[in-house]
Amino acid sequence: MPDENKQPLFQIQRVYLKGLSLEQPNSPAIFLEEQSPTLEVAVSTIAEQQADGIFESTVTVSVTAKIRDKVAFLVEAKQSGIFEIRHLPAEQLNPALGIGCPTILYPYLRANIADAITRAGFPPVHLSEINFQAFYLQQQKNKMATQPGQTAEEPAMALEQE
């Protein structure tokens, strides 16, 4: 069957927590602080082809909570997924990997981060929604401004939350 007759295919094969780390360098003293922490959140995405039509997409989020100048906790989590993507026009593949896949993975990542922070004894942190289309467009703009030969990992987006 010629390629032009094949229907585009986008399927989730698997969603998994690729990595999770939590540090509490100032526990237990930090629990006695009455001030609310300030949060710094950084987000990055990457997609890699694993086989013909099979891609791994990963969203990484780092959350650092500080009270005054002391770190209350630092969480880094990587949520990944295996996606089968076939017969997609070339101009649609990168947006599918940079927008579609992260949009699917991010809710799982948000839940895993909130759970880890709660299990560490802190109030849950509910990360804001991310518009991955705007994130992707910003990444493309940043790529155009950088020199060739840079890493395949997408630049991080930093968010501030109170």
Curated annotation (Swiss-Prot):
Q: What is its main location?
A: cytoplasm
Q: Does the keyword Ribonucleoprotein apply?
A: no
Which key words are in the record? Chaperone, Cytoplasm, Protein transport, Translocation, Transport
One GO term under biological process is: protein folding
Q: One GO molecular function term?
A: unfolded protein binding
- Subcellular location field: Cytoplasm
User: InterPro entries under this entry?
Assistant: SecB, SecB-like_sf
Q: Please give the GO cellular component terms listed in this UniProt entry.
A: cytoplasm
Subunit arrangement? Homotetramer, a dimer of dimers. One homotetramer interacts with 1 SecA dimer.
Q: What does this protein do?
A: One of the proteins required for the normal export of preproteins out of the cell cytoplasm. It is a molecular chaperone that binds to a subset of precursor proteins, maintaining them in a translocation-competent state. It also specifically binds to its receptor SecA.
Instruction: State the family it belongs to.
Output: Belongs to the SecB family.
Write down what this protein is called: Protein-export protein SecB 2
